[in-house]
Amino acid sequence: IGQQRFLRLLAEDYGVATTTLHTAVQAWLACAEGKDPNNERGLLRAEQNLRKTLRAPRMHLLTQFNELPQGVKFLADMRSQLLSIKHESASLNAFDKEFKDLLATWFDVGFLELQRITWDAPAALLENLANHEAVHAIRSWQDIKHRLAAADRCCYALIHPQMPNDPLIFMWVALTNGIADNIQQLLRIDNDEVAEGNADTAIFYSISATQPGLNGVGFGSFLIKRVVDE
């Protein structure tokens, strides 16, 4: 409740100042429509001031959180709260669009690491996989061990450097001979393993995102392309 109240405060009171924006627009128009061909410097200053004015004070505040330990995780969680209330007003909806664009810069795919997750990964990371599997529930530690340690099973995830144990999105892959008849055949843990190098087919049978606050910041297609390359 407290965080939602804080988000409403940011949306209502810390957006772009319309009076200041109007002044900046008028200053830019005066320079742009001026007849002085030597006024390029003034026009550039007006453009710079206009861009600065268009950046809401709340965005500057959120940027400060990014500097803190686990700051990006905190902000992703904060946006998940905003998503649940953004329908309440136009100002909250506008705030959400700004927030999403901000997160998209911090979670740009160029900053993310593709990792193959193995059974030797930290327990916290394995627990996150189990808790966020959205397609085929992990039924036991034996189940997750099979998915990670079997010679014909792989798991790949996109990891942000500041969130090493919180994969943003992950995918399970089964290496097989031919296409499996059904998904249950892939999920059974007592199947004979396909020896490394003998598989002729890779089946991507599940992909799950873990951060609701990054909704709209797409990683899925990038992850698939990277795993195909691997």
Locate each region found by the language model.
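Extended, composition-driven regions rather than compact fold-specific motifs
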Residues: I1-E230
